[in-house]
Amino acid sequence: MKKLIILAVSVFALFTSCQQRPQVFGVYIDGTFEQFLKDLDKEPWKCPINIDTIQHLSESEISIKAFSTEVIDLNEDSVKVDSIYITIELEKEKIKQFSYTLDMSETDFKAIQHAYERIYGSVKYHDITEYGNYCSWMIGKTSLWLSYDFAEQQTKYEYFIY
């Protein structure tokens, strides 16, 4: 049975040059979420979001409150993001989907898209509809989707693990 966990956190996105995935900084944790961070990295305040690492976690290990500040390295000017929502969908202790949404402009979305192109290579799929701007990459067995909702003015990241 799938369990949907929504974790609301505040975030700052600092755009600087770097060739790695986004990293979470300044994490204030509660319960087993602390162990979750320690398992990913011995320095929980500088812990990368690593989809491959968190696949094995069970529902009880991850349904915990947390507050974090995130740095997204993009070689752009600093931008403050008001909120971020992390969604983790679990089935039989394996994560099927990992997504989070940021309140930001389409300009910020395009900056993130260009940064991901530098990190992951050319976009596999790209489309612009009346509802939003969509693009995706394939990273091994993981599909990374980046979309911008015109109505909500939100950028959403989604990881689908196959």
Give residue ranges: language-model regions.
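Sec-dependent signal peptide recognition
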Residues: 2-8
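Repetitive helical segments and hydrophobic/amphipathic motifs
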Residues: 11-12
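C-terminal motif of bacterial Sec signal peptides marking the signal peptidase cleavage site
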Residues: 15-17
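Non-cytosolic coordination micro-motifs
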Residues: 19-63, 91-162
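A general secondary-structure signal for short beta-strands and their flanking turns/coil
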Residues: 61-64, 81-83
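Extracytoplasmic/periplasmic/luminal assembly and interaction segments
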Residues: 64-78
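A structural motif
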Residues: 82-92
